[in-house]
Structure formats: structure tokens, C-alpha cells
Amino acid sequence: KHWKVRLSDPNPEVREKSRIGLAQAMREAKGVGGTSVLLVPGRVKGDQETHQHVWDRSIEQIRKLIPLASELKIHILIETVWNGFCYKPEQFRDYIDAINSPWVQAYYDIGNMQKYGPSHKWIRILGNRALKLDVKDWGSKNGFCPLGQGDVDWKKVRHELEQIEFRGWATREGNDGGV
């Protein structure tokens, strides 16, 4: 639903519906023993939904949910995806920082963002904002591919994860026939 019912939608009623859906997901996560929910905050879609619109509208809605996140002890984790939003690690870091809550962090997808810059650089810049990871590979010649067959420099990724003392969860994502 996060592609159709977005926190960044031009229609305030759709944004409210998205916020209510996220609150429900947070309660459900708590109910099953989860610690976080994944969120795609919006999608850049033209003049009515620009990068700045996604930034401003999604932050406004996310901030409304911070008290619930704190009460439930459920993190809202913003995932890095191909939605036209924050394709530079500095932008994504600044977006997380603009929300200004320990309950809102990053769900960094290693393969997704390799397309826009070396994954190890993203990890270094995001630092301890990266609470959880998706692990997959991506290559400029072969798209999503088995681990080790794309452009991700896994040795540098591991090094940067050690440097930021990453201790969160890493989920293997993909149906690429790898590992």
C-alpha cells in the first residue's frame, strides 16, 4: 500500500489514511513482539509531489507518530528505495536528522542504493542511523543479482559496518538464486 497510500500524497485525506495505516502497523508489530516497522515515506511523482513535498509532508506525518513509537517502543525505519527521494546519502542522513527522534531511523537496503553510489559510502555517512539492513547485490550490468556478482564491495561494506559498530538485524532479501 505504501506506493498508493503515501504520507507525501498531495491529498491531505490520503496522507491521513497513510498515517493511520502506519499507526496500525506499529500496534500490530508490538502485538507480535516486533521492534520496528518499515516505511517508504513517499514517492516523487511530478509537480504535485516533488522532492520537497515528500520531505515536508512525510516529516509532518511521521512526527505525529513519534509519541506512539515511544509509547510502544517501536522504531519507524525509513527504507531506501527507488522512489525518487533522497538518492544521495547526505540527503538521506539529513532527512532522518530533520525528524529528530531516536524512534525514527534508517532501514538501509545495501543493494537498492548501490545504483546511486557505493554502499559502503552510504553506511559511513548514515552511521548509527542505520538500525537494520537489507542484504542484496546490484550491478550496473546485471541489476539485482546473486550476492558477490554485482557491484557491491562487500569487504568495504563489512569494514564500514564494523566502523559504525553495527549490531542490528540484517535480512537477506531477494529471489536471485544466490546464497
Question: Predicted regions: what is each one?
Answer:
Residues 2-108, 113-115:
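Active-site acidic/histidine proton-transfer and metal-coordination neighborhood
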Residues 27, 35, 63, 89-179:
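Histidine-acidic metal/acid-base catalytic patches
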